[in-house]
Amino acid sequence: MAASCEKVALDDVQGDELNAKNIRLNVNGDFGAPTFTRTLSADGHDMTDLWVFDYVDDECVQVVHQTDEDVDFGTPELLMTFGAHSLYIVASRGVNPDVDDVEHTIVWSGVRDTFWNGFDCVVTSETASEQDVTLNRVVSKLKCSVNDKIPDGTATLLMEPECWYYGIDYVTGEPTAEDDAGISINVPSSYIGTSGVLAASFYTISGADEWTTDFTLSAKNGNNSVISSVVVENAPLKANRATIYSGNLFSSGGMFTFTLDSEWMSDKVLTW
């Protein structure tokens, strides 16, 4: 489905009447893992949304938004006028996306795996009607694995970062919507009394340059009281990299180790 973000109506107009051409984009991912299928999947998880923002002379002329319910998901089609265009494309499985085409941002209530690319192109009558487009991962993943025994009463695991990014500037691909709100997950009751099974992954939008943040990882009971916590300083994050911490949370004096996931861009390990 397409929506105009300017007063340039391209819908229901024949290409030859407007000096325009229908262009279909075949969207793929480039992140050192299996490439997108037509269901747009990465690391075994399907993307849920795809946006294409079409700009002419720095003005947005149309937005195409697809969801995973569309039969042509991953192959959006645009009617593009002849001349120079800038296209910005985002694919994500983030939660509750909020698109602002004035500020050119997408902000999610929960960040998940997300891919982006932006490029310039010139459309003529000779332009191929199908174009392949490769997107790049623009998230960091912070994974925390708890190795020691989970005590009775543990209900949630809470990660509270000093800095976290919930949005992307879809023109530049840079992170936006900085926040320090905590992110929590429920601990399954079947995990109580077990060791080495509790792990949680948290995603943030990131740029290509490494940055750091402090965070607190806490276990809470059903009354929201803290059972145990650990503070980690200077956790290194960057796009297309998984930063992995593992160690003891409930044992006194426990330390956490750190790694970078080799299934993503590179490999790295730390201790807390």
Segments the model singles out, each with a brief description of its role:
Residues 27-44, 145-153:
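Structural motif
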Residues 105-138, 143-147, 231-272:
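Extracellular beta-sheet/turn segments enriched in Thr/Pro/Gly and aliphatic residues
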Residues 22-26, 51, 88, 130-132, ...:
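Beta-strand secondary-structure signal
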Residues 110-190:
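Acidic, serine/threonine- and glycine-rich low-complexity intrinsically disordered segments
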Residues 18, 45, 137-139:
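Short, surface-exposed loop/turn motifs at beta-strand boundaries within globular domains
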Residues 2-33, 144, 240, 261-272:
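Bacterial Sec-dependent N-terminal signal peptides
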Residues 41-101, 153-241, 266-272:
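Tryptophan-paired
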